[in-house]
Amino acid sequence: MSREAMYDIVRAPLITEKATALSEKNQVAFKVAIDATKPEIKVAVETLFGVKVLGVNTLVQKGKTKRFKGRPGQRSDVKKAFVQLAEGQSIDLTAKLV
């Protein structure tokens, strides 16, 4: 799998209160492609960040129905991945990628 394909799978880090609290438990949260599978996410994170991944949990957050100019519309669904890292490993999301 090419690095470009991996960047298509792992879209962005998820910076929320929950994600920050999970960092104490050696977990990191990412927004990922809606069609990405757990094995693909694991390989992409291990390759891009140079860490050992123990497990991946995913969820799909359904898009909200919103109104625009009086007409109902739908926001896009978002897939989130919570990645469990091996003991003693971490990812610095503020530094540049490997």
Swiss-Prot record:
Entry keyword set: Ribonucleoprotein, Ribosomal protein, RNA-binding, rRNA-binding
Gene Ontology MF terms: rRNA binding; structural constituent of ribosome
GO CC annotations on file: ribonucleoprotein complex; ribosome
GO annotation terms (biological process): translation
Pfam families the record matches: Ribosomal_L23
Origin: domain of life: Bacteria
InterPro entries, alphabetized: Nucleotide-bd_a/b_plait_sf, Ribosomal_uL23-like, Ribosomal_uL23/eL15/eS24_sf
Self-association and partners: Part of the 50S ribosomal subunit. Contacts protein L29, and trigger factor when it is bound to the ribosome.
Protein's job: One of the early assembly proteins it binds 23S rRNA. One of the proteins that surrounds the polypeptide exit tunnel on the outside of the ribosome. Forms the main docking site for trigger factor binding to the ribosome.
Record-linked HAMAP family: Ribosomal_uL23_B
Family: Belongs to the universal ribosomal protein uL23 family.
Protein name in UniProt: Large ribosomal subunit protein uL23
Organism field: Gluconacetobacter diazotrophicus (strain ATCC 49037 / DSM 5601 / CCUG 37298 / CIP 103539 / LMG 7603 / PAl5)
